């Protein structure tokens, strides 16, 4: 009897607990609305990323040491863009790269594990009113004013609570194809002002050397503490293009490839240099072999055994 009574009491507690949770507990599943962000936002006053950057061009172009490098958004304007970054491997920290058809911008957020709520391919609506637009190393960025180590006020990270009120998830699983930045020794045609922050791919390149004498064959230094390691590429000018790797990246102590590779990543601007930031090791693949006869009429593959015949 005591055992029966015990089970009856447990069942009653479970029913009471479930009723206390109320309808709101099940609401996301019932309404289909996203469990993160602000679902009250509506798609009104939407402008492109290019228009936003044009509107705040002077602040984006100003070094914080030379003047004010950010400004508050006072208008009720929004952008609609797709997440192209991921912090899943630890190489990207507390920021999102957002991209639309006109360009890209970085959002600085004081939150780890952003890939959980906002994985690659998530389309978001971002309400910009009361946030700030400025730059970090001339890279366009959305954030809030923050005092840096030197005591200067620059654009910094939005708190998690504030950020949660400023975005709405519109859809997931969207595909963003990387645009070719360059191939081999060819110079890029990308523009630092308009293309900074975009998802790109550099093809047929190889790792040359790092800026850390202790790091000779790994991506970064996992025991080096806060900081990063920059690798130059044999085929590109190291003053213009580097591969950025955080010491906190999960792949920091992995060996860099020795052969030719294609590298996908977020191509961020840092002053007058391009920083390629990979999201995980999946962004680096052996270089695709270029077929010089691709697209030409005729038969054959151009080898001695099977010469090209265009007759």
Language-model region placement:
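OB-fold nucleic-acid-binding modules
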Residues: 21-93, 97-309
């Amino acid at each position: 009897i005591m055992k029966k009574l015990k089970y009856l009491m447990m069942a009653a507690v479970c029913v009471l607990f479930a009723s206390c949770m109320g309808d709101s507990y099940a609401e996301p599943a019932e309404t289909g609305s996203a469990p993160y962000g602000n679902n009250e936002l509506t798609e009104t006053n939407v402008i492109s990323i290019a228009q936003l950057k044009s509107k705040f061009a002077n602040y984006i172009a100003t070094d914080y040491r030379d003047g004010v490098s950010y400004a508050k958004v006072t208008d009720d304007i929004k952008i609609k863009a797709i997440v192209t970054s991921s912090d899943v491997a630890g190489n990207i920290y507390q920021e999102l790269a957002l991209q639309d058809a006109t360009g890209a911008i970085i959002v600085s957020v004081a939150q780890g594990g952003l890939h959980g709520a906002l994985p690659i391919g998530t389309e978001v609506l971002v309400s910009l009113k009361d946030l700030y637009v400025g730059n970090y190393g001339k890279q366009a960025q959305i954030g809030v004013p923050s005092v840096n180590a030197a005591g200067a006020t620059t654009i910094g990270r939005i708190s998690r609570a504030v950020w949660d009120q400023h975005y709405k998830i519109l859809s997931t699983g969207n595909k963003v194809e990387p645009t070719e930045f360059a191939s081999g020794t060819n110079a890029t045609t990308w523009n630092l002002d308009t293309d900074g922050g975009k998802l790109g791919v550099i093809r047929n390149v190889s790792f040359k050397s790092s800026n850390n004498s202790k790091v000779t064959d790994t991506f970064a230094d996992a025991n080096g503490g806060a900081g990063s390691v920059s690798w130059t590429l044999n085929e590109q000018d190291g003053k213009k293009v580097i591969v950025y790797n955080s010491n906190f990246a999960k792949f920091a102590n992995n060996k860099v490839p020795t052969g030719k590779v294609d590298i996908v990543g977020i191509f961020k601007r840092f002053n007058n240099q391009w920083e390629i930031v990979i999201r995980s090791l999946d962004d680096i693949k052996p270089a695709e072999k270029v077929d010089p006869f691709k697209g030409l009429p005729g038969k054959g593959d151009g080898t001695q055994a099977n010469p090209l015949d265009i007759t």
